[in-house]
Amino acid sequence: GSTTAESAALR
C-alpha cells in the first residue's frame, strides 16, 4: 500500500 487509507488501516 502507498495510500493514506492503507497506511491508517495498518496502523
Swiss-Prot record:
> What's the superkingdom here?
Eukaryota
Q: What is this protein called?
A: Unknown protein 7
Give the originating organism.
Answer: Ginkgo biloba
